[in-house]
Regions:
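Active-site donor-binding loop signature of nucleotide-sugar glycosyltransferases
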Residues: 32-34, 57, 92
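Cell wall/extracellular polymer interaction/catalysis modules
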Residues: 1-50
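Conserved hydrophobic/aromatic pocket- or pore-lining residues that grip, position, or stack substrates
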Residues: 18, 55, 82
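Exported/periplasmic cell-wall-interacting domains
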Residues: 2-4, 44-50, 59-149
Length: 149
């Protein structure tokens, strides 16, 4: 997918970094906080899924919560949310500044300023004055997200 002009997001669980690529050229790098169980099994532990995904839904802000026993939380006005697999998303995290260390319930946390940059760089585009956008295979595929150890 590293074809000339193709945008894609590379996330390393081990180094806790996110790199934005345009083809084979890196254009932005920042620290992240992925799932607190590191390389554990997603779905059974608080780890981030690994694999190749696409951003399929974006929200300027949203409420995020969990119904998992012993891991309940509710966070309102989470900024710059980009879902890539089920309830897993890249998003801004205003509640901590511990980037570069595992910490989340499985999402990929970014500093709000970094999340904003990624949000406007990645597709699907959110039209002016809209709050959210959804990718459609028929009209526009979301940006590739590659998450690996």
């Amino acid at each position: 997918w590293a074809k000339k002009g193709t945008k894609w997001i590379d996330i390393s669980i081990v180094s806790q970094t996110l790199t934005l690529w345009e083809g084979d050229r890196p254009v932005y790098v920042t620290l992240v906080s992925s799932g607190k169980d590191g390389l554990g099994e997603p779905g059974k532990t608080l780890s981030t899924p690994r694999g190749t995904f696409r951003v399929y839904q974006k929200h300027i802000t949203t409420t995020m919560d969990s119904e998992v026993a012993d891991h309940e939380f509710e966070l309102r006005d989470v900024p710059w949310v980009m879902y890539f697999k089920g309830g897993y998303a890249l998003h801004g995290a205003y509640w901590h500044d511990d980037f570069g260390k595992v910490r989340s319930h499985g999402c990929v946390n970014l500093a709000p300023i970094d999340a904003r940059f990624v949000f406007f760089w990645a597709s699907p585009d959110v039209p002016l004055h809209w709050h959210a956008a959804y990718a459609s295979d028929a009209t526009e595929q979301g940006t590739i997200v590659y998450i690996h150890p």
